Design a protein with these regions (language model features):
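Structured catalytic core of nucleotide-sugar glycosyltransferases
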Residues: 1-122
Length: 122
């Protein structure tokens, strides 16, 4: 089965992580129906709130969620790079945790990239 890794950089996102989890969990079910596993990599970029605690909670509940934690704020690009180095999927998506880009679009993007005409879909 193929795998899609979603890299999610986070900085002080304790309030939005649960909403993101709720949305991406539904997407996971859709992807499994398309013969694709989901791996979510949450990257804590030195948050000062309880973002890391929430990440630990979610990863403890779900084997398909992993987290990486920085000791201080290194910036979004460093968080993305760290996530990419741990991605296991044949496909990778970068996504902000604030749901600005709806996770519900991921299955449609997967369908497009699987057609083989494109190397990148956004």
């Amino acid at each position: 089965m193929e795998k899609l890794s979603v890299i999610v950089p986070c900085f002080n996102e304790q309030e939005t992580l649960q909403d993101y989890y709720d949305a991406i969990s539904k997407v996971r079910e859709t992807l499994l129906g398309k013969e694709c596993e989901l791996q979510v990599i949450l990257v804590d970029d030195g948050s000062k709130d309880k973002t890391l605690a929430k990440m630990k909670e979610l990863s403890g509940q779900c084997s398909w969620i992993r987290y990486i934690s920085f000791t201080r704020n290194f910036g979004k690009e460093a968080a993305i790079y760290a996530g990419l180095t741990h991605a296991e999927g044949e496909y990778v998506s970068l996504m902000d945790v604030d749901l600005q880009d709806p996770p519900e679009l991921i299955p449609e993007m997967l369908d497009i990239i699987r057609q083989g005409e494109y190397d990148c879909v956004g």
